[in-house]
């Protein structure tokens, strides 16, 4: 259906949302836009990573056939309000927010707590996607993320502080924690958008998420 509707000028520019999960666990701490099929996707999200790889490949082929300007974005750890809560399958921030607000005590987090990730609020992600679509450069492949990282232990403590909760925090080192540091090289992204990447701080974003959760659950 996409390939047939793409014949219209309305569809001559498309954006496909991939994921940073396509990248392998090996490589630098700050990941640039790497080759799509370089080694296997990260182990903790391997199925999802492969699905996104094939999505990129499929739409890249269709865009060439239909002469479409295809923008492919690879977001890193996006969070925000209106998140779909799916229990143990939720990503880190929404899962921790829910468990802390549900008064789970002790609170058990996976891994050592020292693993570091970069996080970007959904507002900034959507804003950046809009700027990418407005950019005249064709056939863009770009990461959406930041170089700045925060440890899981610090993330837990921030959520507890903002929510006014004080559970006993335990870290289960028998559970997988993925690569130790995962962040995004922002060189290409900064060139494309010509604007700041982060406008919603991690503290402000978590506060928004907590308030939304309280109002809706």
Question: At which residue positions do the language-model features occur?
Answer:
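C-terminal substrate-binding subdomain of Rossmann-fold SDR/epimerase-dehydratase oxidoreductases
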Residues: 102-217
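Single conserved hydrophobic/aromatic residue that forms the stacking wall/gate
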Residues: 1-11
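Catalytic helix-loop patch of NAD(P)-dependent Rossmann-fold dehydrogenases
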Residues: 21-72, 77, 83-84, 88
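Conserved active-site helix of classical SDR/Rossmann-fold NAD(P)-dependent CH-OH oxidoreductases
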Residues: 53-60, 93-98, 126-127, 153
């Amino acid at each position: 259906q996409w390939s047939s509707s793409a014949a219209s000028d309305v569809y001559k520019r498309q954006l496909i949302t991939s994921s940073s999960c396509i990248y392998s666990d090996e490589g630098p701490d700050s990941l640039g836009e790497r080759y799509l099929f370089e080694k296997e996707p990260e182990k903790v999200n391997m199925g999802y990573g492969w699905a996104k790889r094939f999505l990129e490949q499929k739409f890249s082929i269709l865009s060439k056939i239909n002469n479409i300007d295809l923008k492919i974005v690879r977001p890193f750890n996006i969070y925000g309000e209106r998140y779909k809560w799916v229990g143990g399958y939720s990503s880190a921030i929404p899962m921790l927010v829910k468990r802390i607000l549900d008064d789970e005590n002790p609170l058990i987090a996976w891994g050592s707590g020292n693993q570091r990730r970069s996080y970007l609020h959904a507002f900034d992600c959507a804003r950046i996607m809009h700027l990418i679509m407005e950019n005249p450069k064709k056939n863009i492949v770009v990461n959406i993320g930041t170089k700045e990282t925060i440890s899981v232990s610090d993330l837990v403590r921030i959520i507890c502080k903002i929510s006014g909760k004080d559970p006993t925090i335990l870290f289960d080192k028998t559970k997988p924690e993925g690569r130790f540091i995962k962040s995004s090289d922002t060189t290409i992204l900064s060139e494309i958008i010509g604007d700041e990447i982060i406008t919603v701080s991690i503290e402000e974003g978590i506060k928004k998420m907590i308030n939304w959760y309280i109002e809706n659950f």
